């Protein structure tokens, strides 16, 4: 009997030890990054695997679908294993997630920055999120196709000249074998290009006129006719049927441009790697020009440059996971592997060890700036309840494009929707 009891005690001890060591393994520091940029998912996955291989620290990267970051973040933060690293791109995001944003003012990664101009700070001046890259967007041009159609970049200096070139190409699309614009898709993967980035144009000019630098309670929509100008040009000079834009995807638009079926493609510097890599486009055949919409003096406009790409570290994560996350970020911005990925995938970054970006669109942005052109800053960072407001604009654009509604629905969503969402956000 004593032998049996001793044996049972030994078994219990072994099981207890196993459970203890299992618990220790589960408590090892780790990093969970909820990535904002679908186009950079593969690069982040590769970098995370490399870091884990070198350090033994597990890094998990999950990428939210385009246009669904806020809802994905909300769902993930409610889980027991929440992101330790996430996106907090503007003051509205900080208002939503202030309790989750660790003070990064004295973090080693923050001290590696060359400027704090775009960092997100709270009312006390504490840095709650750091800007890890600066981007530009505009109209990407296949200059080889443009020249094949008998035109050149030098012709396009404002909306009137852009319209003339685009309409000529569209009229001869069958003969040329390509059209003017890639599809202006309004499905969830693509709509942000137009409810956010294109809608920035009327916001920017209205805010500039009125010296608005903080989120306003209301907007007038003074430049919505200009928004209509460029939207009409997009949807009426493309191979895509405007009736079907609600199901047209980001991938379809990229493929149309990347495979030589369209001359113009509204998107940003983040597409450089995909266009030259996945689609094998010749870098010499790519350029980015401003989005012209008929505003007086737009001949002096540059690209739309700014950022909403800001890292925040989860203040509610364990101290061990916070440290692991900060160590990972420091490695990303100082190591050869990390800085090379950032240069290749993200373009312009403001860290001391940053490599020169190979991204030609970043060079285009700098060329406009050097020529004295004004930057079209990212006014959309002031949008209240961003995803809800944008969904209203998308609904208006969808109905208008399909012929089941008129432009007034877009105006209502833009102006009245702004006031409604501001009130909802600010109480």
Question: Model-derived features: where do they sit?
Answer:
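Short, well-ordered beta-strand elements
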Residues: 27-38, 57-62, 85, 128
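Extracytoplasmic "Venus flytrap"/periplasmic binding protein-like
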Residues: 50-115, 144-150, 157, 263-264
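Extracytoplasmic/periplasmic substrate-recognition and gating elements
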Residues: 54, 79, 149, 278-344
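Hinge/lid segment of periplasmic solute-binding proteins
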Residues: 89-147, 193, 197, 285-290
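Short, solvent-exposed loop/beta-turn-alpha elements that line the ligand-binding surface or hinge
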Residues: 103-117, 155, 185-188, 203-229, ...
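Extracytoplasmic/periplasmic solute-binding protein
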Residues: 128-132, 137, 163-216, 262
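Conserved C-terminal helix/tail region of periplasmic/extracytoplasmic solute-binding proteins
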Residues: 147, 171, 336-339, 358, ...
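Glycine-centered hinge/linker elements that transmit conformational signals in sensory
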Residues: 166-167, 213-247
């Amino acid at each position: 009997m004593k032998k049996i009891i001793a044996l049972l005690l030994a078994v219990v001890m072994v099981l207890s030890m196993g459970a203890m060591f299992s618990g220790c393994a589960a408590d090892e520091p780790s990093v969970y990054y909820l990535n904002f940029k679908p186009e950079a998912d593969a690069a982040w996955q590769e970098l995370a695997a490399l870091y884990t291989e070198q350090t033994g620290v597990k890094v998990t990267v999950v990428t939210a679908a385009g246009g669904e970051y806020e809802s994905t973040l909300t769902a993930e933060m409610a889980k027991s294993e929440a992101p330790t690293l996430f996106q907090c791109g503007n003051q509205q995001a900080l208002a939503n997630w202030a309790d989750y944003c660790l003070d990064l003012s004295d973090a080693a990664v923050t001290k590696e920055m060359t400027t704090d101009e775009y960092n997100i700070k709270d009312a006390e001046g504490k840095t709650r999120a750091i800007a890890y890259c600066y981007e530009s967007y505009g109209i990407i041009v296949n200059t080889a196709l443009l020249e094949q159609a008998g035109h050149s970049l030098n012709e396009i200096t404002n909306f009137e000249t852009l319209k003339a070139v685009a309409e000529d190409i569209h009229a001869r699309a069958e003969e040329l074998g390509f059209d003017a614009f890639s599809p202006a898709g309004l499905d969830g993967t693509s709509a942000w290009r137009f409810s956010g980035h294109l809608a920035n144009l009327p916001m920017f000019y209205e805010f500039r006129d009125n010296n608005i630098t903080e989120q306003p309670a209301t907007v007038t929509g003074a430049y919505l006719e200009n928004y209509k100008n460029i939207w009409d040009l997009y949807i009426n000079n493309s191979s895509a049927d405007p009736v079907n834009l609600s199901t047209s995807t980001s991938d379809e638009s990229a493929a149309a441009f990347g495979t030589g079926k369209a001359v113009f493609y509204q998107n940003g510097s983040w597409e450089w790697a995909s266009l030259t890599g996945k689609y094998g486009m010749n870098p010499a055949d790519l350029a980015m020009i401003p989005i012209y919409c008929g505003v007086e003096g737009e001949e002096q406009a540059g690209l739309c440059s700014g950022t909403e790409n800001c890292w925040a570290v989860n203040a509610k994560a364990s101290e061990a996971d916070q440290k692991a996350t900060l160590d990972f970020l420091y490695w990303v911005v100082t190591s050869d592997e990390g800085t090379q990925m950032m240069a290749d995938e993200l373009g312009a970054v403001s860290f001391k060890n940053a490599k020169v970006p190979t991204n030609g669109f970043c060079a285009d942005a700098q060329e406009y700036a050097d020529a004295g052109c004004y930057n079209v800053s990212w006014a959309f960072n002031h949008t209240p309840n961003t995803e809800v407001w944008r969904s209203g604009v998308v609904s208006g654009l969808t109905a208008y494009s399909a012929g089941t509604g008129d432009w007034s629905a877009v105006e209502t969503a833009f102006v009245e929707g702004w006031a409604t969402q501001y009130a909802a956000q600010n109480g």
